[in-house]
Amino acid sequence: MFSFLICLALLIGGYFVYGGIVEKTFGPDDRETPAVKINDGVDYVVLPQWKLFMIQLLNIAGLGPIFGALQGALWGPIVFLWITFGTIFAGAVHDYFSGMMSERNEGASISEIAGIYLGGAMKNVMRVFSVVLLVMVGTVFAVGPAGLIVTLFKNGGHEGIVATTLFWLIIVLVYYFIATFISIDKIIGKIYPLFGICLIIMAIGVAVGIFTKPEYTIPEIWNNFGSMHPSGTPVWSFMFITVACGAISGFHATQSPLMARCMKSEKQGHFVFYGAMVCEGVIALIWAAAGCSLYEVTGGLNTGLAAALANGQSAAIYDVCSKTMGGVGIALAMLGVIACPITSGDTAFRSARLVLADWFKIDQKKWQNRLMLCVPVLGVGAILGIGNALGKIDYTVIWRYFSWTNQTLAMIVLWAASMYLFYDKKNYWITAVPATFMSAVSVTYFLLGNECLGQFLNTKTADGATVYNTAVAYPVGVIVAVLVLGIFLYTIKKRNPQPHYETLHK
């Protein structure tokens, strides 16, 4: 329990102390923001700070800090350390700079930001990468909730069209189209804050349930320092990839520009971007604690939590909420596992529209131009989603790459932020250090993961267990990360700080 409380205190303190250092390094001022300067009534709309925070939290969180934290808890309470320090020194820094770099460049999408600071080649790579990733996220977050709704109807004894995935998938996609098309303050600005509050209440309820029920005890880090994973999966770098949104996530960089286009003042960035990520870290810490404590009494992490997750992540959420909060928890769990993915899915498609708009310089104030991008983006999502619902398309294997690509995107954004700070004559080490660390994480996992090069480099024991090639992956990951840092330092040595803001909307 004390480990959890210490980590919780560090997260809260980190917002004020290290978050203040990050903000001071960036140097927000009183310049006119894109929301005030452009204000097109569609994507550039001034929103109140509390709404900015809640929308940003729900955009970046969804079910990420819940699923990732529960999976991360398989390694034991050591996951508390990554959630805590990863959030403070990497994730929140990443989110702050991805949002503020966008704000300084008139709300540019992350692909355009990468191009400004890392070159034209990286811009094109990031454009394609971002659109594909966002459409994939949006599609999966349409199919998932549709399937859960069907399960609820079938469990209630309902039959017919309302008990089919295709029916609810079409309804979710229609909602996505509307939310992607209309002004951000019409739906997202109105209902997201409510769902954000529900996400926070659900986490608080779980925490209260753990502390008030004597049968649950949160294990201490110092008594369980090491991997407790049932399959013997290494902590490095699997845990760092698995937790994902609970500590750092490149997906957040695609969402931060949405709120960068809605801020009235640059000084709101600390609360909106850094603060939302710290809040997500707290949520992840609570769910990781639930994973470590609720199932330890039923046979230990190796059997209890693994068995719960084997029934599906949504089932695990349902189980945690029912054990900690009873009937109220079940209602919140159902709202969470259905509403939270949907609120991440619609902003994923909205971000895809904006990436394409920035790419092809298509003004989004006119409804015809928005329609021109919404139709193909949602059309591809519909083809993938309906194809999957009908059993014609299986993108499960492709989706397994998401965790790795997600953290690789975070790595790229941190390097872009490092170059930004160099050009601005600021302390670039505040982003270069986590960028180097995430480079090591990304490369190491690419060599270890069975969906990556691990399928060729790993071996199997007689009973089918995987023997990971850590002797190769660990040193190579570190060496490549150091080389990337060396390339960065060599590059800035050859360049001079210079003005670097681009006007995308003239």
Language-model regions: role of each:
Residues 1-19, 72-102, 111, 330, ...:
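Extracellular loop-to-transmembrane helix junctions
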Residues 9-27, 129, 145-149, 165-212, ...:
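Membrane-interface loop-to-helix entry segments
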Residues 10-66, 268:
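Membrane-interface "cap" regions at the ends of multi-pass membrane proteins
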Residues 10-11, 15, 56, 90-106, ...:
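Helix-loop-helix module between adjacent transmembrane segments
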Residues 48-64, 207-215, 224-287, 332-344:
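Hydrophobic, membrane-embedded alpha-helices of multi-pass small-molecule transporters
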Residues 99, 209-221, 274-319, 386-393:
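Extracellular/periplasmic helix-exit of transmembrane alpha-helices
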Residues 123-127, 162-170, 275-284, 292, ...:
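Loop-to-transmembrane helix boundary motifs in multi-pass membrane proteins
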Residues 138-156, 163-168, 180, 199-226, ...:
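Hydrophobic alpha-helical segments and their helix-loop junctions in multi-pass secondary transporters
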